[in-house]
Amino acid sequence: ICTLILWVGKYATLDRIVKWVILTLTITTIIAVVLVSIKNTTPLSFIQVFPAETNLLFLIAFMGWMPAPMDISIWHSLWTIEKNKELGAEVTMKESLFDFNVGYWVTLILGACFMGLGVFVMFGTGTEFSSQGGVFASQLINLYTSTLGTGVYLLIAVAALTTMFSTTITTLDASPRAMSKTIELLYPKRKRNDYKLWLLILAGGTISIFVFLLSEMGLLIRIATVLSFITAPFYAFLNFKLVRSDQMPKKDKPGKGLQILSVLGLLFLTSFAVGYLLIL
């Protein structure tokens, strides 16, 4: 369905659909967090515990996509270019930054909400969660309904559906755009847009994973998030280099304060990635 929407509707349809999906996701998720926090009777512990070696992989995987992968900046840039084509006018830097910041903060807030749901509903239940996607989804919804009652089944189902749909359709659009742009930059003489070709490749690969590796979805997610975490310093360096290069208009370049913060962030990401690789 997502592939068909992107194939026929292109960016304009994606933009319209995602806005409503994210709005629905945000409302249902926040309501779920409020309800489950009201029902919770277990006191929360705020003692910081350094993860044992066995849990370090989970922490790294968690950081890899929290609140979003580092290459989200590439996705947003490509979507801005596409929006310029759709509108027939150039989106200003102020508008682009506002759009990015809103999306990033919403992602961050939703990430915190999902953490809260995990703490209130999943943590300490003793349930051994399945690595199979369908079984895990069933376990998750059953936990929520047993905690909040069957009346919230539809609310949780809508939140889960919009989460998966928004993630699928945005990734399914952004990755082919990134690959198509990469080929264009590597081979400037090529005039053909390979977006639809990469869309088919990604869709076909995704379906193949579902068919042959459905029982190992947990492992696949860990691999993807860990790789995202390890490659984060590379993307961060490229971003930092680009915004300081001559390709960025002088008036739009970051100030000294933001550049210092960027260097500190780059050192943080690099230190964590190198440290993780050393203890493997």
Task: Indicate where each model-derived feature is located.
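Hydrophobic alpha-helical segments and their helix-loop junctions in multi-pass secondary transporters
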Residues: W7, L23-F50, L59-L78, A236-M248, ...
